[in-house]
Structure formats: structure tokens, C-alpha cells
């Protein structure tokens, strides 16, 4: 550039600052990028209280079903009246909600002979003695004690007001001569220690029955007849925790006289508080 002097214009040069300014801008952008990355990692590594990391959702409550064990016998003239009471209760609540078992046993039970089908069993007699049954018909609802059939409706109504601390799912299959499958126990409320009991019952058995009028009906249709205890008379110990599922496998042989399409598996969990939940499922053909 030219600067005026008294001797005339004087040519001078000035060094440009452009490269330095560009370097400063680049360093500034780089520094901002590094700071941003540091802030991002800082935010990601922020400590979160354990209680705020995952929100636990309690399993939904399910309704409780009721187990009604009817200590009955083919030579019991009042037992058909008790069976009719069960029919009325199941019509009101359904047979899947009020699950009945006809426990043929005791002095009025009948083991059968060469000509006549008997439905009493050794296991049934053992349960009869275990519960100290005094007369027939007499029932045990949810393993809470004995009761007369005239009281069953009221007891069932009260038991159905409860919720179950666990859910039971049954997978039962049959090849015609035996049954097998699995039981899934899902904990819903607290930790549960108890016994899992598995029974096989049979519907629609035509056999002798003494009637209230003193006659003998040889074509009486017996329902939910106890056949066998799959896993022992007392069942097996289980421990089910809330939010977890426990699975138990089972297998059992069928007697030649049983009709597979009429068979049901009943599964229930009980402890000193009685039956906590009960379910039933038909055996499905493989």
C-alpha cells in the first residue's frame, strides 16, 4: 500500500492475519466438540437410584376357585341329595370355578364285585380316616374342615370372595393308556410354601347307587369320581415366589376301565391356610 511522505508516496507491505484467524476458529470448534462429548458421557454415567431404575409391577390378582370334596358312597341313601346340591352350586358358579370331587369311601363306599362296578378306593378310605369323617354325605371345602351339604352353598360363596396368591396352568395329555404333562405355578402375591396335589377324576360313570327312597338305581350317572392321587396322598412340596413361575412335570397310568375322554386332572396348592388355588383340565389326546 502507499503511505504519503514529504518525499512522495512510499510503498509498504502488511502481513495478512487470515491463516492465524482460521486456526483459532478451528481450535475453538474442536474445543467445543470435546466439551460437548464430555458433557454427553457425563450425562450417560449419571448415577440413578436403584428404586428408580426399574419400576416393579405386581402381577394382577386372579379370582380364587373352590375345591369341594364330597365324601360319598354308593350305599349312602342321602348322597344323591348332596350330589344334587353340588349340581346347583356348579350351575350358579360353573364347574371350573367350584371344582368337585366325589370321594367314594368309608363304610358306605362299595369296592365292587364280579357283577357290579364299585367306585370306592383305598386312597379314598385313607382320606376318609385322615379327615375323621363322621357320616356320609359330608364334605371338606378348601381343606378348611368338615361340613354338612346343607352348608356348602354358603361356604362356597364366602370362599369365592377371596383372591388367589398364585395361578395354576395345566397341560395334560393322554395316549389312551396313560396321562402326562406339566403344571405351571405362577406366584402372584408373596412367597408361598405348600403342597401341590394332583388328582385324576372321572365323569359319566354308570354304576349302582342307593337312592333316598330306599331303591337301588343300577344306572345312576356318577360325576367327578376320584380315581387316583398322581403324586402321593399328601402331594409334593413346592415353593413359589411372587413374579416367578415354577413348573412340575407329571405322569400317571390309567386303569383299563377308565374312559380317557371322561378324565380330568385336578391340581391344587394347599398349606395350613387351606387350599390356595385349584384348577382342572381335561386330558387331551396326543
Give the residues covered by each predicted segment.
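Bacterial Sec-dependent N-terminal signal peptides
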Residues: 5-7, 23, 27-32, 36-67, ...
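Short alpha-helical segments and helix-capping/turn motifs at coil-helix boundaries
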Residues: 11, 83-86, 122-125
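Intrinsically disordered, low-complexity boundary segments flanking structured domains
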Residues: 53-55, 86-91, 127, 154-158
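Intrinsic-disorder-associated, low-complexity terminal segments enriched in Asp/Asn/His/Tyr and depleted
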Residues: 17, 21-23
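Short N-terminal helix-initiation segments at or just after the protein's N-terminus
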Residues: 45-49, 82-83, 212-214
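Local sequence-structure signature of Cys/Sec-based thiol-disulfide redox active-site neighborhoods
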Residues: 58-103
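Short, conserved sequence motifs used for protein processing/export or organelle targeting and
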Residues: 96, 102-286
